[in-house]
């Protein structure tokens, strides 16, 4: 009888099914961030021939914006669009940003006049990076709120849903 009651409420292993979707989404976003963080410098310095200082500047800007944008994304969600729409919009921006990262253009070449880079590819790269940053800004602060809303007020399982 307990298993039919659990299934009727849309639970899986004692928690709402939506928790696992939120968990998978958060896992994907964190994998994206840490993977990008470690590969970005190599990509910029080896493929586009940025100096170490310039590559670290882009990496530092990316990392700081990823941590700063959730303040703005949470504010916009709270005041204007709501948390579910913010999570969806953030996820779509993240997908678009990662799809844009698939376009790499031509590798930079060292010439006697300096470094010759594919400026169109770099423009797409920066746009894609911006889409990822804004996507994280909408997704990150609001997905935790969605997890909290999956449980009724006072539900003993609520704390376990965040761990």
What feature does the model see in each segment?
Residues 1-26, 30, 109-123:
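Cytosolic juxtamembrane N-terminal segment immediately preceding the first transmembrane helix
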Residues 17, 54-55, 89, 154-163:
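Cytoplasmic loop-to-transmembrane helix junctions
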Residues 28-39, 43-45, 139:
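Conserved extracellular-gate-facing transmembrane-helix segments in secondary transporters
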Residues 37, 60-79, 95, 127, ...:
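Central cavity-lining transmembrane alpha-helices of secondary-active solute carriers
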Residues 38-58:
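Short amphipathic helix-loop junctions that connect adjacent transmembrane helices
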Residues 79-95, 154-158:
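Cytoplasmic membrane-interface "Motif A"-like loop-to-helix N-cap segments
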Residues 88-120:
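C-terminal ends and interior cores of transmembrane alpha-helices
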Residues 138-152:
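Intracellular juxtamembrane helix-capping segments at the cytosolic ends
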């Amino acid at each position: 009888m307990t298993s039919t009651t659990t299934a009727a409420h849309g639970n899986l292993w004692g928690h709402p099914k939506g928790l696992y979707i939120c968990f998978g989404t958060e896992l994907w976003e964190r994998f994206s961030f840490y993977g990008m963080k470690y590969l970005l410098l190599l990509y910029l310095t080896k493929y586009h021939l940025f100096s170490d200082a310039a590559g670290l500047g882009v990496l530092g800007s990316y990392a700081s914006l990823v941590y700063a944008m959730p303040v703005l994304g949470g504010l916009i969600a709270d005041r204007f669009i709501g948390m579910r729409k913010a999570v969806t919009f953030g996820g779509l921006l993240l997908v678009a940003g990662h799809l844009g990262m698939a376009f790499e253009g031509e590798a930079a070449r060292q010439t006697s006049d300096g470094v010759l880079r594919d400026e169109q590819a770099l423009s797409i790269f920066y746009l894609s990076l911006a889409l990822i940053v804004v996507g994280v800004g909408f997704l990150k602060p609001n997905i935790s709120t969605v997890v909290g809303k999956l449980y009724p007020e006072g539900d003993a399982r609520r704390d376990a849903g965040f761990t």
